[in-house]
Amino acid sequence: MKVSTMREINPKETTRAYAFELWMKAPMPMVTFFKILDVNRLVKISKESGMKFNMLMCWGIGKAASSIKEFYMLPVGDKLMQYDAIAVNTIVMNKDNEVSSCDVPFSADLQLFNEDYLKLTTEVARSCENHDLTESMVIGTSALAQYEIDGAVGMYSGIFNNPFMIWGKYHKGFFRTTLTVSFQFHHTQMDGAHAAKFLDRLQQEINKLLV
């Protein structure tokens, strides 16, 4: 597993200089976008390959984010940090029927990501201990796959500024299977155009996924 690093950078020397000044001390700096994804391909691949739908979603999220430079920066405290790696977080039901948190390092190699996902989530479920990759820029996710929800807003503790995506049950239609997702991001990290590009690329990655 590759060792990732993070370092503090000068916001004034980045493309986020103005956003840093404008949003770092805002009482609510988080923005939420909603999007309906066509996940018919993921459902089909999951059934045919045995790969978990949630793992495929997490990989697609990481793949879409990995080509957008804003995902390698994150405001932490009162600083702007630069990362050289991305991870995707997933929530795991542990052996005590409680939830634990598991960061999975992103790899463009789907098979490798799947191996890490299965290994790490199994360990977290067994140990009931979170697996945190503090040196990676972590994209949070939460899959409430048994429930009909449209998304969530206002998830801001004032401590964690990480981007976060949540979804519920997918809907099977006559011609396609859809999934409504909500994507929350810190306005210092990215603008709306970057977030919209990310969501479009997520759909593109889903559409062209091959196993």
What are these regions (language model features)?
Residues 94-149:
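Helical lid/core segments from catalytic subdomains that handle acyl or acyl-like groups
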